[in-house]
Amino acid sequence: GLVEILLSTPSCGALRLMMPLLVKLSQEGKWIILINPPHTPLFSEWVREGVILSNVLVIDFPETDEDIEKKYLWAYEQALKFHGCGIALFWCDELAIGKGRRLKLSAESGETLGLILRPSIYRRHPLAASSRLQLDIIPKDPEYIEPREYAPLSLKVTHIKGNGAPNKQEYILTL
C-alpha cells in the first residue's frame, strides 16, 4: 500500500521511527530504496542498528536536472512494482492528484510498502494514499534546537486517515 507521511521538519525522526522495519527488511534480503532524501542518512548508525547496507539504494538526481520530477516519479513507480523491494521512501513536495493515484495503483500491484514523505504544509492537499500520518517533534524545553537524526526525541504521531481505522488518533512515542 501507499502511505503519506507529513513531516513538521525534514529531520523529525521518521527514519528512526521506521528503523525496526528497515532492519527486518534488510536482513530478509529485501531492498530499501530511498528516493530524494533531504539529507544523507547516518548510515553508520543504520549499521549499528543492524541494517545491511548492501540492500539499501539511494536515488538522487542533481537539482539542475530539467526532468528531475519526472525521473523521481518514474524511479519511485519502478521501486513500488519491484517485488524484491520491501520499502520505498520518496521525499517530495507538491504532487499532482493524477500522479498520486498512479503511484497508489503501482503500490497495490507490487508487494512494496510505499511511503511518501512530504512537508506538513501540504496537509490540505492529500494524495490518493491508503493512510496518512502526521509526525511532529515534541520539544523537550524552550531552548529546543532541531535534533540530529539519532538524538533522543519524542514524537507525536497523528493518524489522519486509514482504511477502516478511526480518524484523528494521536500517539506519543519516545525514541
What residue spans do the PLM features occupy?
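N-terminal regions of ATP-driven nucleic-acid and macromolecular assemblies
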Residues: 1-175
